[in-house]
Amino acid sequence: MKALHFGAGNIGRGFIGYILADNDVKVTFADVNEEIINALDKEHQYDVILADEAKTTTRVHNVDAINSGGPSESLKQAVLEADLITTAVGVNILPIIAKSFAPYLKEKETPVNIVACENAIMATNTLKDAILDITGPLGDHIHFANSAVDRIVPLQTNDNLLDVIVEPFYEWVIEKDAWFGPELDHIKYVDNLTPYIERKLLTVNTGHAYLAYAGRFYGQPTILDAVNDDNIRHGLENVLKETSQYITTQFNFTESEQAQYVDKIIGRFKNPNLSDEVTRVGRGTMRKIGPQDRIIKPLSYLYQNNLKHDALIKTAALLLKYDDTNDQETVEKNEYIDKHGVEGFLKSFAKTDDQLTSEIVKEYNVL
C-alpha cells in the first residue's frame, strides 16, 4: 500500500506517518520545506520519540519525499500510485495544496482514500470542496473520508532535523462508511464521526486554548507552567466542566465517560516530559474565535440554553487580550480591535448576538 502525505512537519512525521508506517504503508511526504524534503529523500528514515520517562523510540523506515510547491512529474506519479492521500498542513492551507494535486486525480484510475487530518470539524469536506472546484465531478473510485485526530506534538528542536518527540497518547478516528478497502491498525473506524470530532475539539483544543491565553495573560511561558499554576488550572477545570455539559447534552457520552476523558486530557497537559510554548498553542486567534470553533461554539449553545458559561466567557476575553507580535492573525486581531473595538470584532468574527457580545466585553474590561 502506498500513501502520499501532505505536510512533512512534526505532526505529519510524528503522528500520521508513524501510524501509516506501522501498517507497512510506503509513505511519500509532500511539502514545500526543501530542507526537510531533502533530508527525508536522503535518509529515508527518522525516529519518533515518545515523551515518557523511558523516551521510547521507534524508527520509521522506507519513506521518501517530494516538493509540493507546484505541478511536477514526481507529484503526479505519487498521486497516480497512491492508495491513500492524507494531509496535516492546517485547514487554511487545504485549498492551496488542492491546487497542487487535484488535476492529477482526473487521470487516476485506481481507488484512493483522501483524508484530511486537521484540527477542524469535517476538514476532509473542506479539502473535497477545494478539489472539486478545480476538477469538477470525479469518479466513484475517489473516496473522501473525514477524520478526527489527536496527538500533542510540541514545538521542538532536535539534534537530528527529522526526529520528532510526541506524547504517548494518540487517537485517529475515520468515517467507516466513507472509507474504501481494508481498515488499518491503530485507527478507529466509526459510523458517526461527529461526536468524536467535537469531543476532541471542545476538550483538548478548548482546554489547550484556555491554557495558552490564560498562561500568556498571567505570565506563564509554557503550557506545563500554566497547568501547574493553581489559579489557571482551576480555571481550566471550570472551562472543561462547561464544555462537558455541551458534549454530554449533544452526544451519547455519559457524564462519567466524559469526566474520565477530561481527567485523561488534563493528565496529558501535565506530562512533565511534554511542554509547549503558550505562543505556539495560542496562535491563530482569528480562526479560533470563529462561531464554529473551540470557544464560541460551546459558549453560544450554553448561553442560548441558559446554562453556566462564565468560564468560556473568560476564555473568549483572554483570547481578545492575547498579544503576540510574531503571530500574524493576532496582529490583525489587535489592529481590528484598535480600529473597530472589541464589540465590532466579536460581531464580525465570532458572530455573537448583542447580549453575548456584551457579556464578553464586560469580562474583557475587568481583566
From Swiss-Prot:
<dbReference type="InterPro" id="IPR008927">
    <property type="entry name" value="6-PGluconate_DH-like_C_sf"/>
</dbReference>
<dbReference type="InterPro" id="IPR000669">
    <property type="entry name" value="Mannitol_DH"/>
</dbReference>
<dbReference type="GO" id="GO:0008926">
    <property type="term" value="F:mannitol-1-phosphate 5-dehydrogenase activity"/>
</dbReference>
<protein>
    <recommendedName>
        <fullName>Mannitol-1-phosphate 5-dehydrogenase</fullName>
        <ecNumber>1.1.1.17</ecNumber>
    </recommendedName>
</protein>
<dbReference type="InterPro" id="IPR013118">
    <property type="entry name" value="Mannitol_DH_C"/>
</dbReference>
<dbReference type="InterPro" id="IPR013131">
    <property type="entry name" value="Mannitol_DH_N"/>
</dbReference>
<dbReference type="InterPro" id="IPR013328">
    <property type="entry name" value="6PGD_dom2"/>
</dbReference>
<dbReference type="Pfam" id="PF01232">
    <property type="entry name" value="Mannitol_dh"/>
</dbReference>
<dbReference type="Pfam" id="PF08125">
    <property type="entry name" value="Mannitol_dh_C"/>
</dbReference>
<feature type="binding site">
    <location>
        <begin position="3"/>
        <end position="14"/>
    </location>
    <ligand>
        <name>NAD(+)</name>
    </ligand>
</feature>
<dbReference type="GO" id="GO:0005829">
    <property type="term" value="C:cytosol"/>
</dbReference>
<dbReference type="InterPro" id="IPR036291">
    <property type="entry name" value="NAD(P)-bd_dom_sf"/>
</dbReference>
<dbReference type="InterPro" id="IPR023027">
    <property type="entry name" value="Mannitol_DH_CS"/>
</dbReference>
<dbReference type="InterPro" id="IPR023028">
    <property type="entry name" value="Mannitol_1_phos_5_DH"/>
</dbReference>
<keyword id="KW-0560">Oxidoreductase</keyword>
<comment type="similarity">
    <text>Belongs to the mannitol dehydrogenase family.</text>
</comment>
<dbReference type="GO" id="GO:0019592">
    <property type="term" value="P:mannitol catabolic process"/>
</dbReference>
<keyword id="KW-0520">NAD</keyword>
